[in-house]
Design a protein with these regions (language model features):
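Short, structured patches in soluble enzyme cores that scaffold and shape functional sites
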Residues: 154, 185, 200-202, 256, ...
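Low-complexity, Ser/Thr/Pro/Gly-rich disordered linker/stalk regions
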Residues: 16-35, 41-189, 269-270, 277-289, ...
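Localized edge beta-strand/strand-to-loop motifs within extracellular or lumenal beta-rich domains
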Residues: 247-263, 267-270
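Conserved His + Asp/Glu catalytic blocks
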Residues: 293
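Generic recognition of flexible, low-complexity loop/linker segments
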Residues: 240-243, 250-253, 297-299, 355-357
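Glycine-aromatic-enriched beta-strand/loop faces of beta-sandwich-type recognition domains
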Residues: 176-245, 314-321, 334, 343-350
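Short, glycine/acidic-rich beta->alpha junctions
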Residues: 142, 157, 173, 236-237, ...
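Intrinsically disordered, low-complexity terminal tails of fungal membrane proteins
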Residues: 1-23
Length: 375
């Protein structure tokens, strides 16, 4: 009875000619909503596809040498950091005079060395119960772009170490407002090789972005609040840092930082491009980069400014401490190493405090740093 009434008053639903004005309005509104959704999805897909296929031109630039850090005056170009470690390391960063007296930094005509102290142990006075002596330096000059050539002869490694060569604003209070570019970084025995990473504020990502590089992309979001501040990193393989890299004679890390993107190459000491040797570096001839961070979804010029060159060897800290339990470093107080004070057998700080001889390989050795910029 009810169905017949509906058909008499409204007509069957499958006959639009019998629909009332109210039904027509509802149908048109529904169709409009569906069309809007389809269009929005198409726009998003188109944008994502465009981003996935977009790539900066990286047109050839003419670079001129602006700064050279080398020889016995190498460390004259740097300020020594002598404050509490922002990365919560088990370390005492010493001033220049102390670094010199402890032989933690020194330079000759051919190389410059920055290392961790190996003299202080559990029976020393003072001991290393609150942290081991080390060094962190930052260049007196800041940069906003350029082509950086770092001749690295030896990379530091060892249980409890967290060394890095990086670019960042020396004002720690505003980090990461001006970005961070990690060029060489590893922890503990560095058996996974070098990690190259960007850290930024929001709106900078490498996810779903075309990249031309030989390294392996890790996390894609560069924002410091995501992935426990892992940043957007590129893994480059075991031979790019640590024992293999050092035994092969080291090499040169090249970093091109420009608005189009940030690219990094690593050249072994016996395979340096001729244009670098000749003093006329041309990244357009170097082939595929080891790491590539294009500007597709990251405004490089806005996110990265006012950066000093930083060299340091942290100990434990937020990253080294976190990675220590899963490393192949000693874990047991009995047998593997001496524990003092009954600390946890997986405690990175206990190992660092009580095993000074194990830091003999924890040193950077550089030939020179050369910074080129466009004329």
């Amino acid at each position: 009875m009810g169905q017949r009434f509906y058909e008499i008053e409204q007509g069957p639903w499958w006959k639009p000619s019998t629909w009332s004005k109210k039904i027509w309005v509802l149908v048109i509104a529904a169709l409009a909503a569906i069309i809007a959704i389809v269009v929005a999805v198409a726009v998003v897909v188109t944008r994502n596809n465009a981003a996935a296929n977009a790539y900066p031109s990286y047109t050839q630039l003419n670079y001129t040498l602006k700064d050279t850090y080398s020889g016995t005056s190498f460390f004259d170009n740097f300020d020594y950091f002598n404050n509490y470690d922002p990365a919560s390391g088990f370390v005492h960063y010493v001033p220049a005079a102390t670094a010199e007296s402890l032989n933690l930094t020194y330079a000759s005509s051919s190389s410059a060395v920055l290392r961790v102290d190996t003299s202080v142990g559990p029976s020393s006075s003072p001991d290393a119960s609150t942290g081991r002596f080390s060094v962190r330096v930052s260049s007196k000059k800041q940069y906003n772009n350029g082509l950086f050539l770092f001749e690295v002869k030896h990379t530091p490694y060892g249980c409890g170490t967290w060394p890095a060569l990086w670019l960042v604003d020396p004002n720690n209070d505003i980090w990461p407002a001006h970005g961070e570019i990690d060029i060489m970084e590893a922890v503990n025995l560095a058996d996974t090789g070098n990690m190259m990473t960007l850290h930024t504020t929001g709106d900078c990502t490498m996810e779903s972005v075309k990249r031309l590089m030989t390294g392996t992309a890790e996390q894609g979001d560069c924002h410091n609040t995501t992935n426990d501040n892992a940043g957007c990193g590129v893994d480059s393989g075991a031979s790019t840092y640590g024992t293999t890299y050092n035994s092969d004679g080291g090499g040169t890390m090249a970093v091109e930082w420009r608005n189009a993107g940030i690219r990094m190459w690593q050249f072994s000491s016996d395979n340096i491009p001729a244009d670098i040797t000749a003093g006329n570096p041309d990244p357009s001839t170097w082939g595929t980069a080891l790491a590539d961070f294009p500007d597709t979804k990251c405004d490089i010029g806005t996110h990265f400014t006012n950066a000093s060159i930083i060299v340091n060897i942290d100990l434990c800290g937020t990253l080294g401490e976190a990675k220590y339990p899963s490393s192949s470093c000693p874990k047991n107080c009995v047998g593997d190493y001496t524990c003092v004070g009954g600390n946890s057998p997986t405690n990175c700080t206990d190992y660092v405090a009580n095993n000074p001889d194990d830091f003999k390989d924890a040193y950077w050795e550089f030939g020179s740093f050369k910074i080129y910029q466009t004329s």
